[in-house]
Amino acid sequence: MKKITAGILADLQKASAENPRRRTNYNLHEQLDDPIQRLCIMGEPDTVFPVHRHLGKWELACMMKGSLTLYIYNDDGSIREQIDMAPGGDTLVVEIPADTWHNYILHEPGTAFMEVKRGPYKPFGPEELAGFKGVTPEKH
């Protein structure tokens, strides 16, 4: 059985604070080529998630700790939707449709969420990274 414990979250928070990217993740899947990717992402408010999309793949985000805003964009870079997420808040889980431009802004140190999506993992290709910047921590 796999678990994400309070101790694991504490270790992830320390690691994310020390990481130059200001975030880290804890994989529940065994291999990067697993058919379903399952990971806990822990980050700090100054981490930058580039605006991206997953071609042909949905993404499920489930809040665990802290708070964030999920931004959904139109193809021209305008904001289509902004969803605030936090444990105990109105929105805890969001399924982002395939091919949807999005990014996250974290509001609290040690914000954690689970991400589930179809694998295998592959780095973003140019068609999956937006040609616009979107909302960034300094613009929020």
Indicate residue ranges for each PLM-predicted region.
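Double-stranded beta-helix
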Residues: 11, 78, 103-140
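Short acidic-glycine-tyrosine-enriched beta hairpin
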Residues: 74-99
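Glycine- and acidic-residue-biased ligand/ion/polar-headgroup-sensing regions
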Residues: 56-76
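A short, N-terminal "cap"/entry segment at the start of jelly-roll beta-barrel domains
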Residues: 1-36, 81-86, 138-140
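Conserved short histidine dyad/triad with adjacent acidic residue
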Residues: 40-57
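Short beta-strand His + acidic residue motifs that chelate non-heme Fe in jelly-roll/DSBH
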Residues: 51, 70-71, 94-96, 102-107, ...
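Conserved hydrophobic/aromatic beta-strand scaffold that supports enzyme active sites
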Residues: 40-42, 60, 93-95, 115
